[in-house]
């Protein structure tokens, strides 16, 4: 199966993308809170 290499790509991707989304959503939440 060609899916054996999938975790080696998926783990760093999730490890980088998930914190990035969390930081951006937190930043937008703080910015909206300051504007209001």
From Swiss-Prot:
Membrane topology label: Single-pass membrane protein
PANTHER family reported in the protein's UniProt record: PHOTOSYSTEM I REACTION CENTER SUBUNIT VIII, PTHR35775
Transmembrane annotation, as ranges: 9-29
Gene name tied to this protein: psaI
Native source organism of the sequence: Zygnema circumcarinatum
GO cellular component, one term: photosystem I
Entry's localization field: Plastid, Chloroplast thylakoid membrane
SUPFAM superfamilies reported in the protein's UniProt record: Subunit VIII of photosystem I reaction centre, PsaI (SSF81540)
Pfam family, one: PSI_8
The protein's name: Photosystem I reaction center subunit VIII
Main location as per UniProt: plastid
GO term, biological process aspect, one: photosynthesis
Function: May help in the organization of the PsaL subunit.
Family the UniProt entry places it in: Belongs to the PsaI family.
Keyword set includes DNA damage: no
Alphabetically ordered keywords of this record: Chloroplast, Membrane, Photosynthesis, Photosystem I, Plastid, Thylakoid, Transmembrane, Transmembrane helix
Alphabetical list of InterPro entries matching this protein: PSI_PsaI, PSI_PsaI_sf
């Amino acid at each position: 199966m060609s899916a054996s290499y999938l975790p080696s790509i998926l783990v760093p991707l999730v490890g980088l993308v998930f914190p990035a989304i969390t930081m951006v959503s937190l930043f937008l939440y703080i910015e909206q809170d300051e504007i209001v």
